[in-house]
Swiss-Prot record:
It comes from Borrelia turicatae (strain 91E135). Gene3D superfamilies: Nucleic acid-binding proteins (2.40.50.140). The gene is rpsL. This is Small ribosomal subunit protein uS12. CDD domains: Ribosomal_S12 (cd03368). Residues 1-25 are annotated as: Disordered.
Length: 124
């Protein structure tokens, strides 16, 4: 327990709150360029080939972002928009690519949850 004099000399430091997505720097989204598009395997007990991209952001950060939905058109040098949000079974993947923004196309033939995958309303 510090004395009053010690607290006057050196006040208490407030604890800094850690953010789940530091590369966004308090912005809702960030633009980036794909440097590598690849598949990774999830941790146990799951098994799949999850599509991810290594993205160099406009603020200089390089992050791994998940590509949601079935099928995608991304390749190296594609311009993408990323948002926060981790993928629980992929360690180190803390961002999602937004479908239907910039060079990323929406998911084809999607009827439900379209807004999350950048799909236009189908013609009746």
């Amino acid at each position: 327990m510090p004395t009053i004099n010690q607290l006057i000399r050196k006040p208490r430091k407030s604890q800094k709150e850690k953010t789940a997505s530091p590369a966004l720097q308090n912005c809702p989204q960030r633009r980036g360029i794909c440097t590598r598009v690849m598949t990774v395997t999830p941790k146990k007990p799951n098994s799949a080939l999850r599509k991810v991209a290594r993205v160099r952001l406009s603020n200089g950060f390089e992050v791994t972002a998940y590509i949601p939905g079935i099928g995608h058109n991304l390749q190296e040098h594609s311009v993408v928009l990323i948002r926060g949000g981790r993928v629980k079974d992929l360690p180190g993947v803390r961002y999602h690519i937004i479908r239907g923004a910039k060079d990323t196309l929406g998911v084809n033939n999607r009827k439900q949850g379209r807004s999350k995958y950048g799909t236009k309303k189908p013609k009746a």
